[in-house]
Amino acid sequence: MGIRSYRPYTPSTREHSVSDFAEVTKSRPEKTLVKFRHRKKGRNNRGVVTCRHRGGGTKKLYRVVDFHRNKHNIPAKVAAIEYDPYRNARIALLHYQDGEKRYILHPLGLKVGQLITSGVNAPLEIGNALPLSKIPLGTDVHNVELVPGKGGQMVRSAGAVAQVVAKEDQYVTIKLPSGERRKVRASCYATLGQIGNIEHRNISLGKAGRNRWKGKRPTVRGSVMNPVDHPHGGGEGRAPVGRSGPVTPWGKPALGMKTRKKKKQSDALIVQRRRKSSKRGKGGRQS
């Protein structure tokens, strides 16, 4: 995957860059594996905004991706690599020997025509899914399950990769992309390899309109609103907040207040918390 940049013909193309889609081999999705997905626009079942800055965007068809990899010991041939508008990773179309077709996340290095499989006795090759107990230490994995049989929930974005670092009786310790080290049941499945489209993080949108195409609306500071709209609003000119600390639009403490529950069931499984992100730069620093 490469990145194509544009000359500054207009202000929006000055910093504009897109993927060259060199790895994509098919433009139209498989009709049996797509469905219409109603867009929530940040509302709940009562129509109340629960997540701000969502709405608009282009219409898209949802590709049904197989995160379970539960067709064990049945080889599948990689028929095509496709673009998925709902995620930043590419997806691979599989044709199983029994005639079924499924989408999976496209691992880096997986080519059209290769055969992959899943199961306890699957070979240690890119794209194959195995229980964590069968994966050697130091192996790169993605699409990791948290609950056996529930399907992969972690390490699913473009370029993401986790690593198996330790094994115990019933648990396997993996290092996540955030730097967190976490115990997962040894019977949970994971897929070998790293997610493809690793250059996605280097793409520059170039203009606000590309965020609107994604369904992301502008974020407005509370200090420039009216008092009826935000606790920070009002005053003459650039007025201070008027409180002991910043708060959310609903009056709860914000910016630094810890929101994680003190007694969380997964605390016993987290060996090392994720590294703190730097506020000054894009990168992170280890704690």
From Swiss-Prot:
Q: Where is the composition biased (Basic residues)?
A: 209-219, 272-287
Q: Which UniProt keywords apply?
A: Ribonucleoprotein, Ribosomal protein, RNA-binding, rRNA-binding
This protein's source sits in the domain of life called: Bacteria
Q: Which SUPFAM superfamilies match?
A: Nucleic acid-binding proteins (SSF50249), Translation proteins SH3-like domain (SSF50104)
Q: Which SMART domains match?
A: Ribosomal_L2, Ribosomal_L2_C
Please provide one cellular component term from the Gene Ontology annotations of this protein. Answer: large ribosomal subunit
Q: Which InterPro entries match?
A: NA-bd_OB-fold, Rib_uL2_dom2, Ribosomal_uL2, Ribosomal_uL2_bac/org-type, Ribosomal_uL2_C, Ribosomal_uL2_CS, Ribosomal_uL2_dom3, Ribosomal_uL2_RNA-bd_dom
Can you supply a Gene Ontology BP term from the record?
translation
Pfam families given in the database record:
Ribosomal_L2 (PF00181), Ribosomal_L2_C (PF03947)
Q: Name one GO molecular function term.
A: structural constituent of ribosome
Residue segments, region Disordered: 209-287
> So what does this one do?
One of the primary rRNA binding proteins. Required for association of the 30S and 50S subunits to form the 70S ribosome, for tRNA binding and peptide bond formation. It has been suggested to have peptidyltransferase activity; this is somewhat controversial. Makes several contacts with the 16S rRNA in the 70S ribosome.
Q: How does it assemble?
A: Part of the 50S ribosomal subunit. Forms a bridge to the 30S subunit in the 70S ribosome.
The similarity comment for this entry is:
Belongs to the universal ribosomal protein uL2 family.
Designated name of the protein: Large ribosomal subunit protein uL2
Q: Which species does this protein come from?
A: Trichodesmium erythraeum (strain IMS101)
